Amino acid sequence: MKKVLFFLLLANNALAQTDSVSVKTDSNNVIFKDEVIVNATRATENAPTAYQFISKKELNKNNLGQDLPFLLDNTASVVTTSDAGAGIGYTGIRIRGSDATRVNVTLNGIPVNDAESQGVFWVNTPDLVSSAQSIQIQRGVGSSTNGGSAFGGSLSVQTQTPSATPFGEASVSVGSFKTFRANAKAGTGLIKKHFFLEGSGSWIVSDGYVDRAASNLQSWFFQTGYSSEKTLLKLLYFGGREKTYQSWYGVWEDSLKTNRTYNVAGTDYGYKNPPYPNQTDNYGQDYLQLLLARQLPAHLHLNAGLFATLGRGYYEEYKAGTNIQNYFDYLPAAYTDLVRQLWLRNVFYGGNFALNYAHSGVDATFGGFFGQYRGKHFGKVIWAQDVAVDKDKHYYDGSSVKNDFNIYARVNYEALDIVNFYLDVQYRYVGYNTSGTDNNQQVYDVKKNWHFFNPKAGLLIKIDAKHHVYASYALGNREPNRDDVLQAYFSSRTVKPEMMDDVEAGYKFLHPKFPFGANFYFMNYNNQLVLTGRLTDVGNPIKENVKKSFRTGIELNGSFHFARKGNKYEKIVPRDVFSINYSFTYSFNKIKSFSEYIYTYDENYERVDTLTQVITHKNTDIAFSPSIIASLELVARPVKGLSIGLQNKAVSKQYLDNTSNEHRKLKPFYYSNLNVAYTLPLNKYGKEITLKVLFNNIFNHLYESNGYTFSERYAFDDGSGTLQTDGPYTYNYYYPQAGFNFLTGVNVRF
């Protein structure tokens, strides 16, 4: 713990693009502009990249307790999914077809992606949106950031800005599937013109759409610090606790027709009936951040900070008909039912800094990051039928250390107010050591070191004040995750890091009423890691490098704002009475050559490796990469304070694997959501009250947004002593999303 506290003194990003970093409030207090904390990991207006900014106002519009991915669903090239089917619990987001392991996520510039799995588990930070000030989505490699390379995109989340005045806020929402959410927050404003203290807490419960997919989630957010005209110092402590009944196995294809909410979790694939009641995932995560932003002389700005992220938890599962000797080698072999817990304990700590110079058309940043992850993986058997077991014994035990270091330099140079030159160079080192035994008692000892050079360059031309064109090139490198490394080790293979060349070119029309953007991208992968159907000796899936694959497409997004002329009815009818927001992506996502492995099993379900079938596929589609993603939002404001929005989403078919097999796919789907919000002033009783209702999937379309597939062949003796084969047989599993459902709530600000 001493080491953790020692490292709680250094972490964030670079500063504003001008010398103005503070604003005066109505009370004449001066408060530092909080957005400078995230600028080093964000694209600026002159950056030659594709990005989208989502304000706190936009985030709050639909915030009734669903996870953050669902509040970003209408942004360009984004597809979301929910294991429980209703947006609460385990949720996921894909950008340009890339899942969360390939999307870099930062909170105030601090990496959120798990250092080993590289995934992002939004369930660990429930109701994060209530504490968010803004989010920027960059698509493609984007600018240099902290943590793993962005292969699909990056999400930069800024937590809430300190308020200069005291405030209080409370919200409650309820909805389908016994969903309930309560949130309360309060702040002191600036005390003695400089000091502040703010806090909030949330509680969310839901039964979920899928059977037993219940969630019980808690979160909190506290920040305190000092703000002046040239300095901001903040200490943040936030985190969450989650207990969710497992729903990550999906629903078998045949069950979709008769019982689309069937959940196999807790039944051990049908061997346990009734289902085990505590087949749950239990995890807690705590974030500590100490952030400093300081305006220096000579047009310099400094950001620095320290962080520690602590995680601890397990998932519990029932296993039927299991040999107890596999867990306790001192016991005689016997088949019994048991309950086991698979544990993870970890800490991730370190710091980052950025020094920014902005003057006379030059905007330059020099920064760096260091983080060390320490993790423990172990398992326990807490109960076995008719067998006395040692509940504290670890039947497997492993430990990991991962060091992540980067240093970068970035410069934007604006020449003659017309041309903006962009150069960004990053060096990143990753060292990973892991050893012990895994869940199948396999022994491992792996040491890996990777060195990555990630250059980026681009050009933005301002044809005039409204018309901008740009082009850029970026190189990204990404290390394999823990599963990739271990499965390669167990199968005596070499797993290579992935590399991607990202070329982007676009046009921006900066009109206040009709903004528009068009972006072309070509993402060329070398050694992309993909699932092949191949398994280790104990049945774990193996990802392998495919030499050549690519994604290319065009993204369109924009808005139309129709304003009422004149101000005769200003107190009754808002000026901006109707808006249309849209995005459209059309893409090709291809693997040039892909080898699929289909295994054969005998009558005892033992694998017969000599009968493995290998099929080579050419020019196939990359899994989970729809060629069309489109969204359309219509927003009407008929009277002041009232907003009515109709959000429409359409996604074309996606394949569950990389074979382009029409029998292994997600069908095209679309849905429409209707949200209504009405805000009224409270006058002497408070600031305002907002009533909100969100109707999801109003046309009750039944669809699936995620899934997985595997194929097997079966061998049998036909009596001649020769094994005959039957198959292959394909098994598809899907994650069904809820039909029509609703959430409604009230928010009061004091």
Question: How would you label these PLM feature ranges?
Answer:
Residues 295, 301-307, 462, 468-474, ...:
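Membrane-embedded beta-barrel scaffold of Gram-negative outer-membrane proteins
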Residues 520-524, 542-658, 747:
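Gram-negative outer-membrane beta-barrel transporters
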Residues 282-439, 460-464, 472, 514-520, ...:
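Face-selective signature of the C-terminal outer-membrane beta-barrel domain
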Residues 69-111, 133:
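Extracytoplasmic beta-strand/coil segments of soluble accessory domains associated
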Residues 174-205, 210-247, 283, 288-299, ...:
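Transmembrane beta-barrel wall of Gram-negative outer-membrane proteins
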Residues 111-139, 158, 255:
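Short acidic/polar hinge/loop motifs at secondary-structure boundaries
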Residues 18-61, 100, 515, 519:
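Short, acidic, small-residue-rich periplasmic hinge/interaction motif at the N-terminus
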Residues 4, 573, 650-655, 678-750:
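C-terminal beta-signal and adjacent terminal beta-strands/loops
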